[in-house]
A protein has these predicted regions:
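P-loop NTPase catalytic core
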Residues: 1-170
Length: 170
C-alpha cells in the first residue's frame, strides 16, 4: 500500500549540532566549526525525499536557524542549503508587527522553479516580485493578501497582475 508522508523537523540546525557533538565524542573535532562528516546524517535525512520507490511521497519541512550570530549555525545552514528544494524565509520585523504569515517574499522561493512552472507563471512571479520589491517587508504580505482576496485562483491572479502592474506604472 502506497503512503504519502510529511515529516516535520523542528530544528535541522539543532539536529546537526547533536550529530556534531556525537562526532566530537568519537574524537573528530573541528574547533568553532562543524565537522562536514558529522553533517552527512542530517543531509541523508533531509535528502530522503529523493530516494523513494513506487511513486510514494515524502515531504520534509525542516527549520534552520540563521542569522543567530553563531558561526556554527551559519556553517550548518550554508552546508545544508544546497539540499533544499525551496526556501521559506521568515521576517522577524513582520512577525513583530503582527503580520502573518511573516514571510520575506523576496528571499523565499522554489529552486529551479522553471522545471515545475510554466513561462506565464514564472513571468507572473517575476512581476509580483517587481511590484512588491519596492515595499518594506512588513508591507509586502498585506499587499499580496489584498491582491489574492481580489482573485479566485492563481490563474486569475496572474491575469490581473499584469493589469495592476500597468496601473502602477501610470
Amino acid at each position: 500500500m502506497k503512503k504519502n508522508v510529511i515529516l516535520l523537523v523542528e530544528s535541522l540546525t539543532y539536529l546537526s549540532k547533536v550529530y556534531t557533538t556525537a562526532a566530537v565524542q568519537q574524537g573528530r573535532q573541528t574547533i568553532g566549526m562543524v565537522n562536514p562528516v558529522s553533517l552527512q546524517k542530517a543531509k541523508k535525512l533531509f535528502g530522503a525525499a529523493r530516494c523513494l520507490r513506487e511513486g510514494r511521497s515524502l515531504t520534509i519541512f525542516a527549520v534552520m536557524n540563521i542569522e543567530t550570530g553563531s558561526r556554527v549555525d551559519d556553517s550548518i545552514a550554508e552546508d545544508l542549503k544546497g539540499t533544499a528544494n525551496m526556501e521559506l524565509v521568515l521576517d522577524t520585523a513582520a512577525a513583530r508587527a503582527g503580520i502573518y504569515p511573516p514571510v520575506n517574499l523576496l528571499l523565499s522561493g522554489t529552486k529551479r522553479a522553471e522545471l515545475i512552472a510554466s513561462k506565464e507563471q514564472l513571468d507572473g512571479i517575476k512581476l509580483i516580485h517587481e511590484m512588491l520589491g519596492s515595499l518594506r517587508a512588513v508591507d509586502m504580505i498585506p499587499q499580496l493578501l489584498s491582491m489574492l482576496e481580489k482573485t479566485s485562483n492563481n490563474e486569475d491572479l496572474l491575469v490581473r497582475i499584469k493589469d495592476w502592474a500597468a496601473l502602477m506604472k501610470q
